């Protein structure tokens, strides 16, 4: 589609306020659950596939425009699978000097931990679906944890509520440790959400821009893990995705509280990603982990509260006490009007 046509469609979209006369609905097909706000946003969730967000679409001039890379595609694609794998209990690589990758040590015993953790590999089940005049939501619970109990010897429940509102999608993760655990349950957390680049049919992948005001960039060692090296960010303010290294993660942090990152498509569409937790790990903590491939056409602005190898180093780790409860909320907000205030002008 030509740029002029897309911009016209966006103008048509703006002629009706987002969320006007919305009638929220939930449908299920082939194991996937679709939340629709009856107006302009639709989200698809995949309980059998790690409980992940499998699709996120906006409606422009009566047509749905999918923004997620490889949305609802559960074939065997070559390369990155896309969508939005949930990273728990250890985003990134776990590494020990003696055993190498995919290992961690608890109470002196070496245990296995796959890259990005095991939650994305498990089946989740639907616990509740609900529609009101203000939202549609589905709550999923992770199952199959006993298969990993030798490597992660804790009892707990882990749920996510996908809540579609009139103007945004909210993900609410809840971790509750069993009161029978004999000590704190350590974990870190992330979401590998991956968007198409460009999201609409305008411009090139490298023309997508992102904005952050995080002062720090956390560097990885040759082993792929964070070992304490922090430098001033090389990506302040507005930056093109083309400035990011090819398929090499850029880890940003250095600020506490709610974390935000903006993404702007060449079409004029923008997304605001924000996340916050009921309690935070002590710094250093990666707040957003950026990963991109402009040749394949995707950009992952991943919300994290973690560092690579957190189970071994303790950096970015959340120690949840027996009987404790912890929540993490992510908001994904689309828009086409003026960008949210950033305090800086784009080039």
Segments (PLM) and residue ranges:
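Sec-dependent signal peptide recognition
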Residues: 2-11
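N-terminal signal peptide c-region/cleavage motif recognized by signal peptidases
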Residues: 15-17
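Surface-exposed acidic/polar loop and edge beta-strand patches at domain peripheries
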Residues: 22-172, 178-347
């Amino acid at each position: 589609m030509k740029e002029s046509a897309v911009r016209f469609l966006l103008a048509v979209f703006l002629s009706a306020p987002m969320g006007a006369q919305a009638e929220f609905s939930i449908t299920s097909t082939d194991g996937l659950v679709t939340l629709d706000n009856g107006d302009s946003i639709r989200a698809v969730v995949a309980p059998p596939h790690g409980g992940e967000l499998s699709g996120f679409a906006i409606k422009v001039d009566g047509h749905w425009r999918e923004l997620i890379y490889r949305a609802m595609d559960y074939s065997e694609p070559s390369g990155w699978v896309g969508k939005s794998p949930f990273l728990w209990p250890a985003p990134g690589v776990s590494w020990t000097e003696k055993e190498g990758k995919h290992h961690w040590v608890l109470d002196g015993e070496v245990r296995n931990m796959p890259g990005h953790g095991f939650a994305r590999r498990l089946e989740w089940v639907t616990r509740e679906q609900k529609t009101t005049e203000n939202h549609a939501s589905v709550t999923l619970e992770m199952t199959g944890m006993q298969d990993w109990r030798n490597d992660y010897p804790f009892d707990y429940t882990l749920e996510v509520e996908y809540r579609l509102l009139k103007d945004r999608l909210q993900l609410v993760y809840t971790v509750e440790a069993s009161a029978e655990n004999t000590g704190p349950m350590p974990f870190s957390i992330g979401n590998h959400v991956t968007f198409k680049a460009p999201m609409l049919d305008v411009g090139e992948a490298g023309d997508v821009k992102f904005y952050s005001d995080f002062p720090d960039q956390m560097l990885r060692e040759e082993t792929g893990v964070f070992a304490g090296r922090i430098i001033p960010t090389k990506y302040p303010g507005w930056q093109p995705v083309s400035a990011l290294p090819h398929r090499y993660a850029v880890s940003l942090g250095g600020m506490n509280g709610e974390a935000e990152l903006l993404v702007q498509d060449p079409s004029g569409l923008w997304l605001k990603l924000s996340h916050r937790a009921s309690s935070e790990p002590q710094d250093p903590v990666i707040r957003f982990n950026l990963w991109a491939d402009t040749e394949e056409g995707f950009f992952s602005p991943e919300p994290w509260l973690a560092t690579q190898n957190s189970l071994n180093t303790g950096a970015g780790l959340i120690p949840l006490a027996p009987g404790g409860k912890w929540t993490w909320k992510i908001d994904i907000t689309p828009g086409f009007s003026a960008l949210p205030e950033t305090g800086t002008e784009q080039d």
